[in-house]
UniProtKB/Swiss-Prot annotation:
This is Protein LSM14 homolog A. Residues 284-320 form the DFDF domain. The LSM14 domain and the RGG repeats are required for accumulation in P-bodies, and the region containing the FDF motif is responsible for cytoplasmic retention. Residues 410-429 have a biased composition (Gly residues). It comes from Bos taurus (Bovine).
Length: 463
């Protein structure tokens, strides 16, 4: 195509095998992949041509459409490229532009992207990667019919073409496309039997086609381009959209981070409203799991403990506890210390009797299966809910309560059962399962909460 052929910039009428006619300015021809690109394309539909699927014409003007050569039925040249007054071939001219355009031009010699014309690599992850659209023209010739700036570093005078030349050009163009191979990698991308890509934009910048032929003899230097500003603005908009589309809880988490004073320990927070369930996160590491370089040395760790001091401290605490129990028992029961609460299978003695084996013997398998280390209050009374809750917390730990936010659904009416003695997760809600420590459905307090029935301790229902 470097021989000065008048195809580039000509107005082309193209009919696909689907009997759809397109008109546009010839943009570029890829003989390797057998594709034709037209700019400023309009679709005129099937126009009463016999076809199974008639398609009406469209008013939209596409910036460019890339057609597959094997699916083109007919191609005719309607108008030659418009002749233009080019600057003289002066080596002092580095770059020139027309005043009517708004975007600056990147270097012809570097084959860089012009305006916002996407590269072929955006269309297919095939052998087209890296091939970009650069300057318009044949052997560096400039065109103004696209309404954009072009390089005038090397211009060819284009003579007027007669009607017979149009026919020869059309035949040669068809022959060139038929010789080129069809690219199977682009099959999943086409939306119709002919179009591979159709991009419709509202931008005033028209992309320029690739040079078909040799590179410009003068390698120009790219000037600071203003066409990169829309790209930066577009990326900035994408970043804003990405920020807006983040989950709301992540934003709340970031807001809480900003309010924490640097260096202060982060305590779990209770949400007070909205839909902030839970009391915060319990010690979740954000830097991933801990990495250990070597195995734990148990011998050196055990050597740090003084077993005698620990044993002495344990005995002191045990004696203090026994003294407290004796002081509490005497005014309540009015009698001496009774059974220690340890149920012996053979009923041999009580816990208040002196242990013949000494105070250091906490387990005697001859007397009982159970040990004598932990003895609770031996008074015959039921522990209060606070004591039982504290005991359960010491034994099993504090459970995670995901639904204990102060906002949300916490009403005492509603349709749910109320949690048991242990204050389960939700106090109301719609049919929430009780998660209390002791279970047991408590009676309703109003509303539609089965107020006609009373749930007793033994789970028997009385009318």
């Amino acid at each position: 195509m470097s021989g000065g052929t008048p195809y580039i910039g000509s107005k082309i009428s193209l009919i696909s095998k689907a009997e759809i006619r397109y008109e546009g300015i010839l943009y570029t021809i890829d003989t390797e992949n057998s594709t034709v690109a037209l700019a400023k394309v309009r679709s005129f539909g099937t126009e009463d041509r016999p076809t199974d699927r008639p398609i009406p014409p469209r008013d939209e003007v596409f910036e460019y459409i890339i057609f597959r050569g094997s699916d083109i039925k007919d191609l005719t040249v309607c108008e030659p490229p418009k002749p233009q007054c080019s600057l003289p071939q002066d080596p002092a001219i580095v770059q020139s532009s027309l005043g009517s355009s708004t975007s600056s031009f990147q270097s012809v010699g570097s084959y860089g992207p012009f305006g916002r014309m996407p590269t072929y690599s955006q269309f297919s992850p095939s052998s087209l990667v890296g091939q970009q659209f650069g300057a318009v023209g044949v052997a560096g010739s400039s065109l103004t019919s696209f309404g954009t700036e072009a390089s005038s570093s090397s211009a060819l005078s284009q003579s007027s073409v007669v009607g017979s030349a149009f026919t020869q050009d059309s035949r040669a163009l068809k022959t060139q496309l038929s010789q080129g191979r069809s690219s199977p990698q682009l099959d999943p991308l086409r939306k119709s039997p002919t179009m591979e890509q159709a991009v419709q934009t509202a931008s005033a910048h028209l992309p320029a086609p690739a040079p078909v032929g040799r590179r410009s003899p003068v390698s120009t230097r790219p000037l600071p381009s203003t066409s990169q500003k829309p790209i930066e603005n577009q990326e900035h908009r994408r970043a804003e959209v990405h920020k807006v589309s983040r989950p709301e809880n992540e934003q709340l988490r970031n807001d809480s981070k900003r309010q924490i004073v640097p260096g202060a320990p982060s305590a779990p927070r209770r949400g007070r409203g909205g839909h902030r369930g839970g009391r915060g996160r319990f010690g979740i590491r954000r830097d991933g799991p801990m990495k250990f370089e070597k195995d734990f040395d148990f011998e050196s760790a055990n050597a740090q403990f003084n077993k005698e001091e620990i044993d002495r401290e344990f005995h002191n605490k045990l004696k203090l506890k026994e003294d407290k129990l004796e002081k509490q028992e005497k005014p309540v029961n009015g009698e001496d210390k009774g059974d220690s609460g340890v149920d012996t299978q053979n009923s041999e003695g009580n816990a208040d009797e002196e242990d013949p084996l000494g105070p250091n013997c906490y387990y005697d398998k001859t007397k009982s299966f159970f040990d004598n280390i932990s003895c609770d209050d031996n008074r015959e009374r039921r522990p209060t809910w606070a004591e039982e809750r504290r005991l359960n917390a010491e034994t099993f730990g504090i459970p995670l309560r995901p639904n204990r936010g102060r906002g949300g659904y916490r009403g005492r009416g509603g349709l749910g059962f109320r949690g048991g003695r242990g204050r389960g997760s939700g106090r109301g809600g719609a049919f929430t399962t009780p998660r209390g420590f002791r279970g047991g459905f408590r009676g309703g307090r109003g509303g539609r909460e089965f107020a006609d029935f009373e749930y007793r301790k033994d789970n028997k229902v009385a009318a």
